[in-house]
Amino acid sequence: MSASGRSAREKLNFQLGLRRRGISDQAVLRALEDVPREQFVEPHDKEVAYADTALGIACGQTISQPYVVAYMTEQLRTHPRHRALEIGTGSGYQAAVLSRLCRQVVTVERYRTLADTARARLAALGCRNVEVVVGDGYDVPDTLGTFDRIIVTAAMETIPDSLMERLEPDGIMLVPVGPPEGVQQLVRLRKGADGVEQEDLIPVRFVPALVGLAKEL
């Protein structure tokens, strides 16, 4: 089978697998179909880009397994008018998916190497509504404004007040909460008029969100 034929089959199996596991939002499925995941993995991993497993990328980080990306994106409940913030750009894949679903995406990455690589990938795909920022996810500056949706793609032991302040009223935040090693809980927060409602979703495993900018890389 040719490489193009194999790729088409892998993408079909990828979509069918997501549907079998309960991903049903058509906009999310279209976004995942539209974004070529193989362009966000390391060259030696291109043949397994659509396997349902996390893959290593630069700076000791990972690109999350496809089901987790799909699940988190669906649970974020995006709308085309939304402005979204991502903490932990990584490969840029999650930001690319969100770019198909939201008006604007701002993604914050502590590693300059990852930020530069993701920025180039996103530009190559024509994701003009994505801004990549080198910064500290624990200290998001006021200058970035507020957001309808926030997604954190690294584990936090506690959610910083500075991040909650970036969330608009009626906004939704998804964040893995728990220890840096072991299993965390994916939590959905909704900022309502009477305070913040918290809902536990599924157990997950993410690399830890670290404080500050990386001194190297």
Swiss-Prot record:
UniProt GO molecular function: protein-L-isoaspartate (D-aspartate) O-methyltransferase activity
Cytoplasm recorded as keyword: yes
Gene Ontology CC annotation, any one: cytoplasm
Enzyme class label: transferase
Active site: S64
CDD domains: AdoMet_MTases
Coiled-coil ranges per UniProt: none
Highest taxon above the source species: Bacteria
Enzyme Commission (EC) number: 2.1.1.77
Pfam families: PCMT
Swiss-Prot/TrEMBL keywords: Cytoplasm, Methyltransferase, S-adenosyl-L-methionine, Transferase
Reactions it catalyzes: [protein]-L-isoaspartate + S-adenosyl-L-methionine = [protein]-L-isoaspartate alpha-methyl ester + S-adenosyl-L-homocysteine
GO biological process: methylation; protein modification process; protein repair
Compartmental location: Cytoplasm
PANTHER family tied to this protein: PROTEIN-L-ISOASPARTATE O-METHYLTRANSFERASE, PROTEIN-L-ISOASPARTATE(D-ASPARTATE) O-METHYLTRANSFERASE
Protein task: Catalyzes the methyl esterification of L-isoaspartyl residues in peptides and proteins that result from spontaneous decomposition of normal L-aspartyl and L-asparaginyl residues. It plays a role in the repair and/or degradation of damaged proteins.
Protein family membership: Belongs to the methyltransferase superfamily. L-isoaspartyl/D-aspartyl protein methyltransferase family.
Protein name: Protein-L-isoaspartate O-methyltransferase
Originating species: Afipia carboxidovorans (strain ATCC 49405 / DSM 1227 / KCTC 32145 / OM5) (Oligotropha carboxidovorans)
Gene name of the encoded protein: pcm
